[in-house]
A protein has these predicted regions:
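An alpha-beta-alpha
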Residues: 45, 49, 63, 148-194, ...
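Hinge/cleft segment of the Venus flytrap/periplasmic-binding protein
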Residues: 282-333
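Short beta-strand elements at the ligand-binding edges of bilobed clamshell
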Residues: 135-160, 259-274
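Bacterial lipoprotein signal-peptidase II cleavage site
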Residues: 19-31
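Structural motif
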Residues: 75-97, 202-216
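Beta-alpha junction/loop-to-helix N-cap segments that form part of ligand/metal-binding clefts
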Residues: 80-136, 228-243, 247-250
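Pocket-lining segment of extracytoplasmic ligand-binding domains
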Residues: 178-254
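Extracytoplasmic "Venus flytrap"
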Residues: 40-64, 70, 77-86, 176, ...
C-alpha cells in the first residue's frame, strides 16, 4: 500500500511539474505577441512632389530613411504632379479625403498646395523649400519642415574665387515659382557686393528654356543654376547650350554637378529630406505638434566639381577650392 501511495505522490509531483513547465512555455510564446503590439501601428503617409527629378527623389528617400531608422511603420501613398498645379491640388484633396496621418510635401508649390487643401488636424511637413516665409508657410499651426535655402553669399564668393575676371552672372527661372523669384531677388541684392551684375531671363514653361539659354549665353561669364523645378527638369538641354558657349555652370545643388555642371555648392536634398523625416518621427511617435517644432534651414554645405566638365571647358580650379571639394563624374540616368 505504501508503495502504491508513493507512486501516486510521485506521479502527482511529476504532473504538476509538467503542467508548470507547460504553462511557462505558453507564457513565453505569448510574450512576444504582447511586445509586437507596441508601436505596431502603420501610419498612412502621403508623399508628393511637383515633378519627378533626382534631387526631389533624393529628398523623398532621405525622409523615408529617417522614419525607418526611428522605427516608424508607414504605408506610403506616393504621388507626382507632373509639373501641373491642378494635379497637385487634386492630389492634396485626395490625401485630405483619405485622412492621412501625415503629409510630406516636397518643393514650394507642393507645400503651398498642402497648406491650402490639408485640414488643420493633419500634420504637413515640407522639404526642399527655398523661402518658407515668402511662400506663406510660416505661422500655420499644422505646418513645419526644412528649408534648403541657397547659400547665395557663399556661392558668390566661390564664383569670384573660381573666376576672378568674371563680371556677369546669368540666371534663368520660372516666374510662377515663388521660391525662384525670391532667390533671384536675393541674388540681385547681393551680387554687386562681389563685383557682379545679374543677367536674368524669366520663363513660364519648360519649352522656353533652351531659347532663354541661347539668348543669355552670349552675354554672361558664368551661369548660376538655382533650385527651380523647371530648370531642374530641363537642365540637360540648357547645359548643352552653355557647354557649347564655353560658359561654366555653378549650381546650388549637387544634382546639377552630378548631371554635368562644372561645380555646385549647397546642402544635399537627401539631407534636407532626412531632417524632415526626423521631424515627422517626433510628431508621430512623441506626439509633438508641428507648431512646437520651428522651421529649420539645413546648412551642411558641400562643394562638388565635375571632372569631365572641368576638362571639357579647360578650367583650372584653384587649389583653395580643390582642397575642400569632392570630385565627381557625370551620372547617367
Amino acid at each position: 500500500m505504501k508503495k502504491i501511495m508513493r507512486g501516486v505522490l510521485l506521479f502527482g509531483m511529476l504532473g504538476g511539474m509538467l503542467l508548470s513547465c507547460g504553462n511557462n512555455k505558453s507564457n513565453d510564446s505569448q510574450e512576444p505577441k504582447k511586445d509586437s503590439k507596441v508601436n505596431e501601428k502603420v501610419y498612412k503617409i502621403g508623399l508628393s512632389q511637383i515633378v519627378d527629378h533626382p534631387a526631389l527623389n533624393a529628398a523623398k528617400q532621405g525622409f523615408k530613411d529617417a522614419l525607418e531608422k526611428a522605427g516608424v511603420k508607414a504605408d506610403y501613398d506616393d504621388k507626382i504632379a507632373n509639373n501641373d498645379m491642378s494635379n497637385q491640388t487634386l492630389i492634396m484633396k485626395q490625401f485630405a479625403a483619405d485622412k492621412k496621418d501625415l503629409v510630406f510635401a516636397i518643393t514650394t508649390p507642393t507645400a503651398q498646395a498642402a497648406k491650402n487643401q490639408i485640414g488643420k488636424e493633419t500634420p504637413v511637413i515640407f522639404g526642399s523649400v527655398t523661402d518658407p516665409k515668402s511662400a506663406g508657410l510660416v505661422g500655420i499651426p499644422n505646418v513645419t519642415g526644412t528649408s534648403g535655402a541657397a547659400p547665395i553669399t557663399e556661392n558668390l564668393k566661390l564664383m569670384r574665387e573660381l573666376l576672378p575676371e568674371a563680371k556677369k552672372i546669368g540666371i534663368i527661372y520660372n516666374s510662377s515659382e515663388q521660391n525662384s523669384v525670391s532667390e533671384v531677388n536675393n541674388l540681385k541684392k547681393l551680387a554687386g557686393e562681389h563685383g557682379f551684375t545679374v543677367v536674368e531671363k524669366a520663363v513660364t514653361n519648360g519649352t522656353e528654356m533652351v531659347a532663354a539659354a541661347n539668348l543669355i549665353s552670349k552675354d554672361i561669364d558664368i551661369y548660376y543654376a538655382i533650385q527651380d523645378n523647371t530648370v531642374a527638369s530641363y537642365f540637360a538641354a540648357i547645359l548643352d547650350v552653355f557647354n557649347n558657349a564655353k560658359v561654366p555652370v555653378l549650381a546650388t545643388n549637387d544634382v546639377y554637378s552630378n548631371a554635368g555642371g562644372l561645380i555646385s555648392q549647397g546642402t544635399t536634398d537627401y539631407n534636407i529630406g532626412y531632417r524632415s523625416g526626423e521631424i515627422a518621427a517626433e510628431i508621430l511617435l512623441k506626439g509633438k505638434k508641428p507648431n512646437e517644432i520651428p522651421i529649420e534651414t539645413v546648412k551642411n554645405l558641400q562643394i562638388e566639381i565635375n571632372k569631365q566638365n572641368m576638362q571639357l571647358l579647360g578650367i583650372k580650379i584653384p587649389d583653395s577650392i580643390l582642397k575642400q571639394a569632392k570630385m565627381v563624374e557625370t551620372k547617367k540616368n
